[in-house]
């Protein structure tokens, strides 16, 4: 679709200020913990690629949107890594991988656009090995009753139309908790350089607590 191709073309320029001011550092800090066999869901245009450390053995990057995936494939082809990188068209809701095959799953700015966040998180848990980790950066809904939450609710529909289906008012923390992930270890951050309605973030690594639920 034309709208998908346009969004894929403007995605990196639109995020550029936020990447320089905050998100690039957030990505680097989070992905320093990646190791072993890694799956990144909703990899988009591949902005995480340059941040993966050499502790990764193999990286699979999945992106269901064809226009985004075309940009991702070009980025993969243009970057040298000490590990193999495989591009998959799989959506997060229906991952074509056996149970327990990944040491780490990465989700950065993905769950806001997932067609079914609950199913996506169930799939993440399924493909993680026992003791594996979910590394995530997700923007979230403002505190209940806050001015920000009211603004997000008011602008949710036009923002979703503009931003490729992104739900600025989604309660992602609730989805994580409902899926059995412990959210206590997540820290809150701010996405500087981006509109206020997507500025609140949760960031963290969920490890063995995934399997204690």
What kind of region is each of these model predictions?
Residues 39-94:
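Class I SAM-dependent methyltransferase SAM/SAH-binding core
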Residues 1-36, 47-51, 66-71, 152:
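Conserved class I S-adenosyl-L-methionine
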Residues 5, 12-17, 137-198:
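C-terminal alpha-helical "lid/dimerization" subdomain adjacent to the S-adenosyl-L-methionine
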Residues 118-133:
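A short glycine-rich, Lys/Arg-flanked "PGG" loop and its adjoining helix->strand segment in the class I
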Residues 90-105:
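A short acidic, Gly/Pro-enriched loop at the edge of an enzyme's catalytic core
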Residues 103-116:
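A short SAM/SAH-binding and catalytic strip from SAM-dependent methyltransferases
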Residues 201-213:
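C-terminal lobe and adjacent flexible extensions of AdoMet/dcAdoMet transferase-like proteins
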């Amino acid at each position: 679709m034309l709208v998908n191709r346009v969004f894929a073309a403007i995605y990196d320029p639109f995020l550029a200020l936020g990447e320089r001011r905050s998100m690039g550092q957030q990505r680097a800090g989070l992905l320093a913990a990646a190791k072993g066999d890694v799956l990144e869901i909703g990899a988009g245009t591949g902005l995480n690629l340059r941040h993966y450390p050499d502790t990764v053995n193999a990286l699979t990057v999945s992106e269901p949107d064809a226009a985004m995936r075309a940009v991702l494939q070009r980025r993969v082809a243009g970057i040298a890594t000490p590990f193999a990188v495989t591009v998959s068209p799989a959506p997060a809701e229906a991952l074509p991988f056996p149970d327990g095959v990944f040491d780490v799953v990465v989700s950065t700015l993905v769950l806001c656009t997932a067609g079914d966040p609950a199913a996506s998180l169930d799939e993440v848990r399924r493909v993680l090995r026992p003791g594996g980790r979910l590394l995530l950066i997700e923007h979230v809904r403002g505190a209940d009753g806050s001015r920000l939450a009211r603004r997000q609710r008011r602008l949710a529909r036009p923002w979703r139309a503009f931003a490729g289906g992104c739900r600025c008012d989604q309660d992602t923390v609730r989805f994580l908790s409902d899926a059995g992930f412990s959210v206590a270890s997540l820290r809150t951050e701010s996405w500087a350089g981006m509109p206020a309605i997507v500025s609140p973030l949760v960031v963290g690594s969920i490890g063995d607590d995934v399997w204690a639920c």
